[in-house]
Protein backbone atom coordinates (compact mmCIF):
# COMPACT_ATOMS: atom_id res chain seq x y z
CA UNK A 1 0.00 0.00 0.00
CA UNK A 2 1.39 3.40 -1.04
CA UNK A 3 0.29 6.51 0.84
CA UNK A 4 -0.40 9.49 -1.41
CA UNK A 5 -0.37 13.25 -0.92
CA UNK A 6 -2.27 14.98 -3.73
CA UNK A 7 -1.59 18.70 -4.12
CA UNK A 8 -4.17 20.29 -6.40
CA UNK A 9 -6.95 17.73 -6.01
CA UNK A 10 -9.75 19.66 -7.72
CA UNK A 11 -7.81 20.43 -10.89
CA UNK A 12 -7.88 18.27 -14.01
CA UNK A 13 -4.78 16.23 -13.08
CA UNK A 14 -5.98 16.00 -9.49
CA UNK A 15 -9.35 14.58 -10.48
CA UNK A 16 -7.76 12.04 -12.82
CA UNK A 17 -5.30 11.04 -10.09
CA UNK A 18 -8.27 10.29 -7.85
CA UNK A 19 -9.72 8.17 -10.67
CA UNK A 20 -6.55 6.08 -10.54
CA UNK A 21 -6.70 5.78 -6.74
CA UNK A 22 -10.36 4.79 -6.96
CA UNK A 23 -9.50 2.06 -9.47
CA UNK A 24 -6.79 0.61 -7.21
CA UNK A 25 -8.03 1.00 -3.65
CA UNK A 26 -5.97 -2.01 -2.60
CA UNK A 27 -2.77 -0.29 -3.80
CA UNK A 28 -3.14 3.36 -2.78
CA UNK A 29 -4.46 5.42 0.10
CA UNK A 30 -4.94 9.20 0.04
CA UNK A 31 -3.58 10.53 3.34
CA UNK A 32 -3.40 14.25 2.51
CA UNK A 33 -4.63 16.61 -0.19
CA UNK A 34 -4.96 20.27 -1.07
CA UNK A 35 -7.32 22.40 -3.12
CA UNK A 36 -7.74 26.11 -3.73
CA UNK A 37 -11.28 27.46 -3.44
CA UNK A 38 -13.51 24.90 -5.17
CA UNK A 39 -15.12 23.58 -2.00
CA UNK A 40 -18.17 22.15 -3.82
CA UNK A 41 -15.91 19.83 -5.77
CA UNK A 42 -13.56 19.11 -2.86
CA UNK A 43 -16.06 18.07 -0.19
CA UNK A 44 -17.26 14.91 -2.00
CA UNK A 45 -13.60 13.97 -2.56
CA UNK A 46 -12.87 14.40 1.13
CA UNK A 47 -15.89 12.31 2.11
CA UNK A 48 -14.98 9.47 -0.28
CA UNK A 49 -11.20 9.30 0.27
CA UNK A 50 -11.12 10.39 3.93
CA UNK A 51 -7.66 12.02 4.04
CA UNK A 52 -6.17 12.82 7.43
CA UNK A 53 -5.14 16.32 6.35
CA UNK A 54 -6.59 18.83 3.88
CA UNK A 55 -5.03 22.18 2.94
CA UNK A 56 -7.03 25.00 1.33
CA UNK A 57 -6.06 28.07 -0.63
CA UNK A 58 -7.67 30.96 1.25
CA UNK A 59 -9.08 31.98 4.62
CA UNK A 60 -12.72 32.06 3.50
CA UNK A 61 -12.53 28.46 2.25
CA UNK A 62 -10.68 27.49 5.43
CA UNK A 63 -13.51 28.78 7.63
CA UNK A 64 -16.17 27.11 5.48
CA UNK A 65 -14.42 23.75 5.66
CA UNK A 66 -13.79 24.12 9.39
CA UNK A 67 -17.54 24.48 9.97
CA UNK A 68 -18.31 21.20 8.21
CA UNK A 69 -18.54 17.91 10.05
CA UNK A 70 -17.10 14.71 8.61
CA UNK A 71 -17.54 11.14 9.80
CA UNK A 72 -13.78 10.88 10.36
CA UNK A 73 -11.02 13.01 11.87
CA UNK A 74 -9.54 15.47 9.37
CA UNK A 75 -7.16 18.34 10.07
CA UNK A 76 -7.37 21.52 7.98
CA UNK A 77 -4.40 23.61 6.81
CA UNK A 78 -4.10 26.92 4.97
CA UNK A 79 -1.95 28.44 2.25
CA UNK A 80 1.69 27.58 1.64
CA UNK A 81 2.17 26.29 5.18
CA UNK A 82 -0.75 23.94 4.66
CA UNK A 83 0.70 22.68 1.37
CA UNK A 84 4.01 21.97 3.08
CA UNK A 85 2.32 20.23 6.00
CA UNK A 86 0.35 18.02 3.60
CA UNK A 87 3.48 17.13 1.63
CA UNK A 88 5.76 16.27 4.54
CA UNK A 89 3.37 14.13 6.61
CA UNK A 90 5.27 11.16 7.97
CA UNK A 91 2.93 8.59 6.39
CA UNK A 92 3.25 10.02 2.87
CA UNK A 93 5.23 7.94 0.35
CA UNK A 94 4.48 9.83 -2.88
CA UNK A 95 3.65 13.51 -3.37
CA UNK A 96 1.66 14.17 -6.54
CA UNK A 97 2.27 17.83 -7.35
CA UNK A 98 -0.69 18.79 -9.54
CA UNK A 99 -0.73 22.42 -8.44
CA UNK A 100 -1.15 25.24 -10.91
CA UNK A 101 1.71 27.70 -11.23
CA UNK A 102 4.83 28.44 -9.20
CA UNK A 103 3.03 27.87 -5.87
CA UNK A 104 4.17 24.24 -6.21
CA UNK A 105 7.88 24.99 -5.77
CA UNK A 106 8.35 25.28 -2.00
CA UNK A 107 6.16 22.29 -1.06
CA UNK A 108 8.13 20.19 -3.56
CA UNK A 109 11.47 21.20 -2.06
CA UNK A 110 10.23 20.49 1.47
CA UNK A 111 8.88 17.09 0.39
CA UNK A 112 12.23 16.24 -1.20
CA UNK A 113 13.97 17.09 2.09
CA UNK A 114 11.73 14.50 3.77
CA UNK A 115 12.67 11.96 1.07
CA UNK A 116 9.21 11.73 -0.46
CA UNK A 117 9.02 10.42 -4.03
CA UNK A 118 7.81 13.25 -6.27
CA UNK A 119 5.29 12.64 -9.06
CA UNK A 120 5.54 15.95 -10.88
CA UNK A 121 2.69 17.37 -12.95
CA UNK A 122 3.51 20.96 -12.01
CA UNK A 123 5.72 22.23 -14.85
CA UNK A 124 6.43 25.54 -13.19
CA UNK A 125 8.42 23.94 -10.37
CA UNK A 126 11.20 22.92 -12.77
CA UNK A 127 10.76 25.89 -15.11
CA UNK A 128 11.28 28.49 -12.39
CA UNK A 129 13.89 26.71 -10.28
CA UNK A 130 15.11 23.65 -12.16
CA UNK A 131 18.69 23.88 -10.93
CA UNK A 132 17.60 24.09 -7.29
CA UNK A 133 15.08 21.25 -7.55
CA UNK A 134 17.59 18.98 -9.31
CA UNK A 135 20.31 19.72 -6.76
CA UNK A 136 17.83 19.01 -3.97
CA UNK A 137 16.69 15.73 -5.52
CA UNK A 138 20.31 14.62 -5.99
CA UNK A 139 21.29 15.64 -2.46
CA UNK A 140 18.44 13.71 -0.84
CA UNK A 141 18.45 10.87 -3.39
CA UNK A 142 14.80 11.40 -4.31
CA UNK A 143 13.32 10.37 -7.68
CA UNK A 144 11.42 12.92 -9.77
CA UNK A 145 8.81 10.95 -11.70
CA UNK A 146 7.14 12.78 -14.60
CA UNK A 147 3.36 12.89 -14.88
CA UNK A 148 3.07 14.94 -18.08
CA UNK A 149 2.29 12.57 -20.94
CA UNK A 150 5.27 13.80 -22.98
CA UNK A 151 7.82 13.42 -20.22
CA UNK A 152 6.33 10.11 -19.14
CA UNK A 153 6.74 8.94 -22.74
CA UNK A 154 10.42 9.91 -22.76
CA UNK A 155 10.91 8.37 -19.31
CA UNK A 156 9.38 5.10 -20.53
CA UNK A 157 11.40 5.14 -23.76
CA UNK A 158 14.60 5.48 -21.72
CA UNK A 159 14.00 2.44 -19.52
CA UNK A 160 16.96 0.11 -19.99
CA UNK A 161 18.85 2.73 -22.00
CA UNK A 162 21.97 4.75 -21.16
CA UNK A 163 21.71 8.53 -21.15
CA UNK A 164 25.05 8.82 -22.97
CA UNK A 165 23.45 7.21 -26.04
CA UNK A 166 20.74 9.86 -26.48
CA UNK A 167 20.96 11.91 -29.67
CA UNK A 168 17.84 14.02 -29.09
CA UNK A 169 14.41 14.17 -27.49
CA UNK A 170 11.46 14.72 -29.81
CA UNK A 171 8.49 16.19 -27.96
CA UNK A 172 5.15 16.01 -29.75
CA UNK A 173 2.55 18.79 -29.67
CA UNK A 174 -1.08 18.74 -30.75
CA UNK A 175 -0.88 22.40 -31.73
CA UNK A 176 -3.80 23.28 -29.48
CA UNK A 177 -7.16 24.84 -30.22
CA UNK A 178 -5.87 27.16 -32.96
CA UNK A 179 -3.44 24.90 -34.78
CA UNK A 180 -5.11 25.50 -38.15
CA UNK A 181 -5.61 29.26 -37.81
CA UNK A 182 -3.41 31.96 -39.36
CA UNK A 183 -1.83 34.77 -37.33
CA UNK A 184 -4.45 37.11 -38.77
CA UNK A 185 -7.28 34.86 -37.59
CA UNK A 186 -5.75 34.67 -34.12
CA UNK A 187 -6.29 38.41 -33.64
CA UNK A 188 -10.02 37.91 -33.12
CA UNK A 189 -10.31 34.55 -31.32
CA UNK A 190 -12.32 34.37 -28.09
CA UNK A 191 -11.74 32.73 -24.71
CA UNK A 192 -14.50 30.25 -25.56
CA UNK A 193 -12.71 29.31 -28.80
CA UNK A 194 -9.40 28.85 -26.98
CA UNK A 195 -10.84 26.48 -24.37
CA UNK A 196 -11.93 23.92 -26.98
CA UNK A 197 -8.90 21.62 -27.05
CA UNK A 198 -9.19 19.02 -29.83
CA UNK A 199 -7.61 16.06 -28.01
CA UNK A 200 -7.12 16.47 -24.27
CA UNK A 201 -9.35 17.24 -21.29
CA UNK A 202 -7.45 19.87 -19.28
CA UNK A 203 -7.91 22.90 -17.07
CA UNK A 204 -8.42 26.41 -18.47
CA UNK A 205 -4.87 27.72 -17.97
CA UNK A 206 -3.09 24.76 -19.54
CA UNK A 207 -5.59 24.75 -22.44
CA UNK A 208 -4.70 28.37 -23.21
CA UNK A 209 -1.00 27.51 -22.85
CA UNK A 210 -1.57 24.73 -25.36
CA UNK A 211 -3.16 27.19 -27.79
CA UNK A 212 -0.18 29.58 -27.54
CA UNK A 213 2.28 26.63 -27.48
CA UNK A 214 3.69 28.00 -24.23
CA UNK A 215 2.70 24.68 -22.69
CA UNK A 216 5.08 22.95 -25.06
CA UNK A 217 7.75 25.54 -24.35
CA UNK A 218 7.47 24.91 -20.62
CA UNK A 219 7.69 21.17 -21.34
CA UNK A 220 10.93 21.73 -23.26
CA UNK A 221 12.45 23.46 -20.23
CA UNK A 222 11.10 20.74 -17.95
CA UNK A 223 12.58 18.03 -20.21
CA UNK A 224 15.96 19.77 -20.11
CA UNK A 225 16.01 19.44 -16.32
CA UNK A 226 14.37 16.03 -15.98
CA UNK A 227 16.67 14.29 -18.45
CA UNK A 228 19.81 16.51 -18.35
CA UNK A 229 19.63 17.15 -22.09
CA UNK A 230 20.90 20.38 -23.74
CA UNK A 231 18.26 22.50 -25.49
CA UNK A 232 20.07 21.96 -28.77
CA UNK A 233 19.11 18.27 -28.51
CA UNK A 234 15.40 18.87 -27.92
CA UNK A 235 12.99 19.21 -30.85
CA UNK A 236 9.26 19.84 -31.02
CA UNK A 237 7.10 18.31 -33.74
CA UNK A 238 3.41 19.00 -34.36
CA UNK A 239 1.34 15.82 -34.25
CA UNK A 240 -2.39 16.46 -34.46
CA UNK A 241 -3.60 13.07 -33.31
CA UNK A 242 -1.72 13.02 -29.96
CA UNK A 243 -1.08 9.29 -30.36
CA UNK A 244 2.73 9.41 -30.20
CA UNK A 245 3.36 11.15 -26.89
CA UNK A 246 7.08 11.72 -27.47
CA UNK A 247 10.18 10.01 -28.86
CA UNK A 248 13.85 9.45 -28.10
CA UNK A 249 16.41 9.27 -30.90
CA UNK A 250 19.70 7.51 -30.15
CA UNK A 251 23.15 7.91 -31.70
CA UNK A 252 22.53 5.05 -34.12
CA UNK A 253 19.47 7.02 -35.37
CA UNK A 254 17.02 4.45 -34.05
CA UNK A 255 13.96 6.02 -32.41
CA UNK A 256 11.87 4.69 -29.52
CA UNK A 257 8.40 6.19 -29.19
CA UNK A 258 5.63 5.71 -26.64
CA UNK A 259 2.13 5.53 -28.10
CA UNK A 260 -1.37 5.42 -26.68
CA UNK A 261 -4.79 7.02 -26.84
CA UNK A 262 -4.94 10.46 -25.17
CA UNK A 263 -5.68 9.62 -21.52
CA UNK A 264 -3.82 11.40 -18.71
CA UNK A 265 -4.67 8.63 -16.27
CA UNK A 266 -2.07 6.42 -17.99
CA UNK A 267 1.03 8.55 -17.21
CA UNK A 268 -0.41 9.41 -13.79
CA UNK A 269 -0.77 5.73 -12.94
CA UNK A 270 2.68 4.88 -14.31
CA UNK A 271 4.26 7.50 -12.02
CA UNK A 272 2.40 6.04 -9.04
CA UNK A 273 3.19 2.39 -9.81
CA UNK A 274 6.72 2.75 -11.26
CA UNK A 275 8.59 0.50 -11.91
CA UNK A 276 5.51 -1.73 -12.07
CA UNK A 277 2.43 -1.48 -14.26
CA UNK A 278 -1.18 -2.15 -13.33
CA UNK A 279 -4.28 -2.61 -15.49
CA UNK A 280 -6.27 0.59 -16.00
CA UNK A 281 -10.03 0.03 -16.15
CA UNK A 282 -11.86 1.85 -18.94
CA UNK A 283 -8.63 2.82 -20.72
CA UNK A 284 -9.19 2.78 -24.45
CA UNK A 285 -7.04 0.39 -26.47
CA UNK A 286 -5.01 1.91 -29.29
CA UNK A 287 -6.15 0.45 -32.62
CA UNK A 288 -3.92 1.91 -35.32
CA UNK A 289 -6.14 0.55 -38.07
CA UNK A 290 -8.97 2.71 -36.74
CA UNK A 291 -6.79 5.83 -36.86
CA UNK A 292 -5.45 4.98 -40.30
CA UNK A 293 -2.73 7.64 -40.50
CA UNK A 294 -0.66 9.93 -38.31
CA UNK A 295 0.43 13.42 -39.30
CA UNK A 296 3.48 15.50 -38.42
CA UNK A 297 4.68 19.05 -39.08
CA UNK A 298 7.69 21.05 -38.03
CA UNK A 299 6.95 23.58 -35.27
CA UNK A 300 7.23 27.12 -36.67
CA UNK A 301 8.70 29.71 -34.30
CA UNK A 302 7.18 32.56 -36.33
CA UNK A 303 3.74 31.01 -35.92
CA UNK A 304 4.23 30.01 -32.27
CA UNK A 305 6.23 32.83 -30.70
CA UNK A 306 5.75 31.55 -27.14
CA UNK A 307 7.60 28.38 -28.10
CA UNK A 308 10.49 30.51 -29.32
CA UNK A 309 10.44 32.57 -26.10
CA UNK A 310 10.67 29.36 -24.08
CA UNK A 311 13.62 27.93 -26.03
CA UNK A 312 15.48 31.25 -25.81
CA UNK A 313 14.74 31.68 -22.09
CA UNK A 314 15.84 28.13 -21.36
CA UNK A 315 19.12 28.57 -23.21
CA UNK A 316 19.85 31.87 -21.43
CA UNK A 317 18.99 30.22 -18.12
CA UNK A 318 19.26 31.89 -14.73
CA UNK A 319 16.14 33.88 -13.88
CA UNK A 320 14.90 34.17 -17.47
CA UNK A 321 12.60 31.11 -17.31
CA UNK A 322 11.16 32.49 -14.05
CA UNK A 323 10.24 35.70 -15.89
CA UNK A 324 8.81 33.70 -18.78
CA UNK A 325 6.57 31.70 -16.48
CA UNK A 326 5.42 34.58 -14.27
CA UNK A 327 4.62 36.85 -17.22
CA UNK A 328 2.73 34.06 -18.92
CA UNK A 329 0.63 33.27 -15.83
CA UNK A 330 -0.46 36.89 -15.45
CA UNK A 331 -1.12 37.37 -19.17
CA UNK A 332 -3.15 34.16 -19.49
CA UNK A 333 -5.24 35.13 -16.46
CA UNK A 334 -5.90 38.50 -18.09
CA UNK A 335 -6.98 36.83 -21.35
CA UNK A 336 -9.27 34.41 -19.49
CA UNK A 337 -10.81 37.41 -17.70
CA UNK A 338 -11.48 39.10 -21.04
CA UNK A 339 -9.03 41.95 -20.37
CA UNK A 340 -6.68 41.40 -23.33
CA UNK A 341 -6.87 39.76 -26.78
CA UNK A 342 -5.22 36.41 -27.42
CA UNK A 343 -2.08 37.66 -29.20
CA UNK A 344 -1.44 40.19 -26.42
CA UNK A 345 -0.32 37.24 -24.27
CA UNK A 346 2.82 37.04 -26.42
CA UNK A 347 3.35 40.81 -26.24
CA UNK A 348 3.21 40.84 -22.43
CA UNK A 349 5.73 38.02 -22.19
CA UNK A 350 8.10 39.62 -24.70
CA UNK A 351 8.04 42.96 -22.85
CA UNK A 352 8.80 41.25 -19.53
CA UNK A 353 11.69 39.25 -21.01
CA UNK A 354 13.17 42.32 -22.72
CA UNK A 355 12.97 44.36 -19.52
CA UNK A 356 14.55 41.77 -17.23
CA UNK A 357 18.07 42.12 -15.83
CA UNK A 358 19.38 38.55 -15.76
CA UNK A 359 20.64 36.83 -12.64
CA UNK A 360 22.73 33.91 -13.88
CA UNK A 361 22.89 31.84 -10.69
CA UNK A 362 19.87 32.84 -8.61
CA UNK A 363 19.13 31.70 -5.10
CA UNK A 364 15.64 30.61 -4.08
CA UNK A 365 15.08 34.10 -2.62
CA UNK A 366 16.21 35.66 -5.92
CA UNK A 367 13.75 33.51 -7.86
CA UNK A 368 10.88 34.45 -5.55
CA UNK A 369 11.74 38.15 -5.85
CA UNK A 370 12.00 38.02 -9.65
CA UNK A 371 8.71 36.15 -9.82
CA UNK A 372 6.99 38.80 -7.69
CA UNK A 373 8.59 41.68 -9.61
CA UNK A 374 7.60 40.24 -12.99
CA UNK A 375 3.99 39.74 -11.95
CA UNK A 376 3.85 43.32 -10.70
CA UNK A 377 5.31 44.63 -13.95
CA UNK A 378 2.94 42.70 -16.22
CA UNK A 379 -0.05 43.71 -14.11
CA UNK A 380 1.08 47.34 -14.39
CA UNK A 381 1.16 47.26 -18.21
CA UNK A 382 -2.28 45.64 -18.27
CA UNK A 383 -3.94 48.46 -16.32
UniProtKB/Swiss-Prot annotation:
Write down the EC number. Answer: 1.1.1.267
Q: Which InterPro entries match?
A: DXP_reductoisomerase, DXP_reductoisomerase_C, DXP_reductoisomerase_N, DXPR_C, DXPR_C_sf, NAD(P)-bd_dom_sf
State a single Gene Ontology molecular function: manganese ion binding
Its pathway? Answer: Isoprenoid biosynthesis; isopentenyl diphosphate biosynthesis via DXP pathway; isopentenyl diphosphate from 1-deoxy-D-xylulose 5-phosphate: step 1/6
Which residues of the sequence carry a binding annotation for Mn(2+)? 148, 150, 219
Q: Which residues are noted in the entry as NADPH-binding?
A: 10-13, 36-38, 122, 124, 203
Cofactor(s) the record lists:
Mg(2+); Mn(2+)
The record lists 1-deoxy-D-xylulose 5-phosphate as bound by 123, 149-150, 174, 197, 210, 215-216, 219
Q: Which domain of life is it from?
A: Bacteria
* HAMAP family linked: DXP_reductoisom
The record's function comment reads: Catalyzes the NADPH-dependent rearrangement and reduction of 1-deoxy-D-xylulose-5-phosphate (DXP) to 2-C-methyl-D-erythritol 4-phosphate (MEP).
Similarity remark: Belongs to the DXR family.
Q: What is this protein called?
A: 1-deoxy-D-xylulose 5-phosphate reductoisomerase
Organism equals: Bacillus subtilis (strain 168)
Instruction: From the UniProt record, report the name of the gene that encodes this protein.
Output: dxr
